[in-house]
């Protein structure tokens, strides 16, 4: 019931076409059920030698009723299409909005391919089910009910024969659903895997071609596609049993009614039931069985779509891990940062902390460098500052206030993060830069690009700042992408700027120009630089050496050379390596 209530809420502004669809279906069914009644009278009048004018009058009435029924059906289809399209639009909007509210912790529960499948294939299935529900799911039960009532009015006990076959039909449908539902559930899960494989392949196409792995990727895709085809074929084979089951029920019932009705007419000479009534009974029998067939179609469709409903509900019912407090602080005073007894793990069930016992104070305007090996939790540390995750123990403060006390948008507006994986979106360079500040002027964008050492190469493009960036920034180099991402971050004019290994694709000269520009033009901004090169952070006011989730050492470059074995080893290996390269 909770699932039904949730999806009914997605009708919203499309209540009117939904209600009109239902009313049209009621009108169509009511007229369709009355037509056999008048047809029976027409047959009896013709058999009894009625005047032609009477026959014509009844015939014209039947034609008019048929046209009205046809009109109701057409309008029902029109309103139903509008309602189902609007319903799907609202479901898609609600799912996308919910995903946008997720923290990294929530997103970690779903793969990106799974979310794409849920917002496309699953919502399309739900839309089809909704369309069937407001049309056929109303039409079929009403037709069954009205036809049974009219059959009893016209045929009395003979109408009971229509109900004999229903238990057979119900048992058959339940057996079909019992087999089909698990099969469709498996199909949708494998769709996630297939989409994940496609997404991964497209994104890494250069790597695939660089290693000549096209054959392997084809085999992997073919195997995933074959698994889906196999499971889907099994599910469809089970569902296909519905059609012969229904045909058996329809033909058996019609033959049985025709046999019993004919015997009654022959035996009683038409005193109990006449030819017109028998013809009407056969029509009502068809309507009853057709309504049951439609109900079985709905049942099969809902069996196929149930897993889609469940998967969409999983997203809609996922509570965002991070929420704003009741009375959030809206202003970040400065760029000072404090870590007080901070420990963190990515899930409550994890046995090991990713960060443990972190205590650190950073004054506003400082430049802080972070070094450490792979897996030392450098990125994890800085992701706690804009509250991409919540700490497990202790607290992180920005501007002297716990980050959990801020409005999330206000906090993240004061913190610019350039992540390891640089992302550009389809659109012009200007469009991408305005992600940092949608109201930025051309002069502000140029200034940010100059500071990020991007202005020169942008101007080298024929269209300059209006150059179109392909999806994922595939038409610019890695270093150019990094510089554009840094410029975008600078446009926010943040109080804290975090560069998470964001200069790895640029040369040492450009890296040095970054640092000089930051010192000169944004001295009030707190700058945190994660790097692999000691040269990138050696001028920092404070350098942290991370090791296995702990701050192993901290100090200036000279202090760490004297006191930190880890730092000294890294520095000497890079210095000696550079000397050997030059030699």
Range-by-range predicted roles:
Residues 331-583:
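ABC-type nucleotide-binding domain
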């Amino acid at each position: 019931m909770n699932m039904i209530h949730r999806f009914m809420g997605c009708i919203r502004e499309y209540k009117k076409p939904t209600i009109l669809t239902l009313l049209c279906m009621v009108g169509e069914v009511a007229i369709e059920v009355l037509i056999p009644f008048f047809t029976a009278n027409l047959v009896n009048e013709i058999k009894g030698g009625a005047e032609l004018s009477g026959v014509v009058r009844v015939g014209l009435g039947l034609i008019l009723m048929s046209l009205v029924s046809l009109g109701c059906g057409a309008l029902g289809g029109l309103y139903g299409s509008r309602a189902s399209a609007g319903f799907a639009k609202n479901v898609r909007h609600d799912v996308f909005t919910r995903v946008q509210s997720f923290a990294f912790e929530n997103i970690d529960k779903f793969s990106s391919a799974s979310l794409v499948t849920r917002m496309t294939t699953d919502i399309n299935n739900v839309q089809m089910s909704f369309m069937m529900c407001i049309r056929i799911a109303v039409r079929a039960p009403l037709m069954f009910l009205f036809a049974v009532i009219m059959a009893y009015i016209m045929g009395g006990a003979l109408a009971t024969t229509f109900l004999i076959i229903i238990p057979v039909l119900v048992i058959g449908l339940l057996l079909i659903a019992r087999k089909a539902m698990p099969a469709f559930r498996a199909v949708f899960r494998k769709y996630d895997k297939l989409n994940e494989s496609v997404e991964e392949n497209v994104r890494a196409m250069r790597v695939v071609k660089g290693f000549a792995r096209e054959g392997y990727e084809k085999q992997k895709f073919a195997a995933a596609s074959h698994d889906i085809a196999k499971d889907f074929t099994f599910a469809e084979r089970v569902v296909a049993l519905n059609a012969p089951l229904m045909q058996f029920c329809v033909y058996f019932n019609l033959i049985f009614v025709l046999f019993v009705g004919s015997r009654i007419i022959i035996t009683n000479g038409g005193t109990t039931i006449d030819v017109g009534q028998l013809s009407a009974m056969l029509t009502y029998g068809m309507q009853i069985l057709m309504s049951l067939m439609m109900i079985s179609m709905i049942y099969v469709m809902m069996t196929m779509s149930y897993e889609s409903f469940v998967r969409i509900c999983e997203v809609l019912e996922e509570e965002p891990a991070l929420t704003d407090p009741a009375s959030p602080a809206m202003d970040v005073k400065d760029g000072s940062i404090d870590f007080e007894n901070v420990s963190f793990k990515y899930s409550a069930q994890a046995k090991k902390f990713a960060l443990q016992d972190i205590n650190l104070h950073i004054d506003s305007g400082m430049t802080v460098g972070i070094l450490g090996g792979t897996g030392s939790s450098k990125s994890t540390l800085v992701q706690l500052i804009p509250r991409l995750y919540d700490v497990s123990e202790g607290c992180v403060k920005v501007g002297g206030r716990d980050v959990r006390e801020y409005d999330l948008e206000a906090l993240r507006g004061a913190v610019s993060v350039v992540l390891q994986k640089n992302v550009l979106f389809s659109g012009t360079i200007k469009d991408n830069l305005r992600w940092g500040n949608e109201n930025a002027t051309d002069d502000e964008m140029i200034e940010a690009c100059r500071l990020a050492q991007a202005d020169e190469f942008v101007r080298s493009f024929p269209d300059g700042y209006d150059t179109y960036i392909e999806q994922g920034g595939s038409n610019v180099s890695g270093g150019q992408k990094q510089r554009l991402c840094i410029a975008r971050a600078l446009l926010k004019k943040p109080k804290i700027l975090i560069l998470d290994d964001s200069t790895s694709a640029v040369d040492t000269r450009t890296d040095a120009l970054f640092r000089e520009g930051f010192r000169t033009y944004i001295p009030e901004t707190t700058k945190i630089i994660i790097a692999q090169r000691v040269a990138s952070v050696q001028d920092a006011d404070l350098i942290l050496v991370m090791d296995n989730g702990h701050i192993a050492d901290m100090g200036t470059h000279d202090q760490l050379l004297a006191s930190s074995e880890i730092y000294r080893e890294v520095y000497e290996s890079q210095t000696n390596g550079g000397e050997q390269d030059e030699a």
